[in-house]
């Protein structure tokens, strides 16, 4: 599994309510994604950063879904380019679901 962190700069003056509205609008698109395991939608108004933390089956899946059309959506919605970081994620402890995911070695 791969954890991907996507970050972008927020427009000046954006509100918490506006961020939540943007995130809610994107929910159906991500719910239908067969390659994504989990997504956390994040923002910090104080630092002016927003983005997402994704859990994918593979880095290829992450790159396929975060293509040019995704970049254009971020540019259109927030006026900034997204940046991407990828991390190998062999173990996940999910206390809410009382689940542990361990990738085979």
Question: What residue spans do the PLM features occupy?
Answer:
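Short S/T/G/P-rich N-terminal loop/turn motif that feeds into the first structured element of a domain
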Residues: 1-50, 59-68, 78-105
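A common structural junction motif
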Residues: 72-76
């Amino acid at each position: 599994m791969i954890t991907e962190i996507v970050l972008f700069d927020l427009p000046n003056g954006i509100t918490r309510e506006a961020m939540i509205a943007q995130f809610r609008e994107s929910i159906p698109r991500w719910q239908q994604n067969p390659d994504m395991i989990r997504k956390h939608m994040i923002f910090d108004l104080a630092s002016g950063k927003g983005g997402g933390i994704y859990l994918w089956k593979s880095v290829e899946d992450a790159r396929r879904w975060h293509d040019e059309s995704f970049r254009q959506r971020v540019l259109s919605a927030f006026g900034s380019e997204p940046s991407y970081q990828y991390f190998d994620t062999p173990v996940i402890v999910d206390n809410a679901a009382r689940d542990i995911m361990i990738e085979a070695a």
